[in-house]
Structure formats: C-alpha cells, structure tokens
Design a protein with these regions (language model features):
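Active-site Tyr-X1-5-Lys
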Residues: 1-28, 44-58
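Conserved cofactor-binding/catalytic machinery of classical short-chain dehydrogenase/reductase
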Residues: 6-7, 76-79
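Hydrophobic residues at beta-strand termini and immediately following loops
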Residues: 25, 64-65, 99
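Ca2+-coordinating acidic residues in Ca2+-binding motifs
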Residues: 26, 79, 109
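Glycine/proline-rich active-site loop of Rossmann-fold NAD(P)-dependent oxidoreductases
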Residues: 30-47, 57-61, 77-78, 86-99, ...
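Catalytic Tyr-x(3-8)-Lys segment
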Residues: 66-70
C-alpha cells in the first residue's frame, strides 16, 4: 500500500512539473488466468484455491488464515486489462483511478 501511495505522489509531481499526462491506476485484489497459486505469496483467490485443493487431496480440513471477516473487493484480470486500456485512452485526471467492482465480500461469505 505504501509503494502505491508513493507512486501516486510521484505521478502527480511529474504531471505538475513536466505537464505529462501520467495517471495512477490502482486495481483491487486481482484474480485470473496465469495467477500465482503459491500459498505463501500468491493473491488471495488463487492461494485459497490451492489451499482448498491440497486439503481435499490430502483429506485434511480446510482452514482460512485470520477470521475471514474483512471485506475485500476482487476484480478479474482481463477486466483490469480492458479498464487499463480505457484509462490510458480516456482518463485524464490527477486523482488516481481505482479499478474495482464495488462489490465487497468476505472470505467466509456464502
């Protein structure tokens, strides 16, 4: 999160100082084809899929780290690609654009 904030500050400074049309695009939790299914450092959705697969394969219970209650927003990787193309062509604001579905769900939500 800190790196994203710092990148946004840098982009704003470049826009102001050099007059370039840089924008800040911030996606929420991404999932999709060719994702990182590593349990330790992958994204939320593929990590959970891999954890569930291993639990079923080894006939072990499936556990989720933490309470599973925090609300998160997820977005499909191909939607991120389309929205990024749109932002490059159409978006010209100094405020960052957050790519999100605006649907908040918890990991425990049915």
């Amino acid at each position: 999160a800190y790196a994203k904030r710092m990148a946004d500050i840098q982009i704003r400074a470049y826009r102001e100082q050099y007059g370039v049309n840089y924008i800040s695009v911030i996606p929420t939790n991404i999932y999709g084809p060719n994702d990182n299914f590593n349990i330790d450092n992958g994204h939320v959705v593929p990590s959970l899929i891999h954890k569930c697969y291993l639990a079923m394969k080894n006939n072990h219970p499936f556990y989720v780290w933490g309470s599973g209650k925090p609300l998160r927003e997820f977005i499909y990787s191909e939607d991120v690609a389309k929205l990024t193309e749109w932002a490059l062509d159409e978006y010209d604001e100094k405020e960052p654009i957050i790519l999100s579905t605006s649907d908040e769900i918890s990991i425990l939500q049915n």
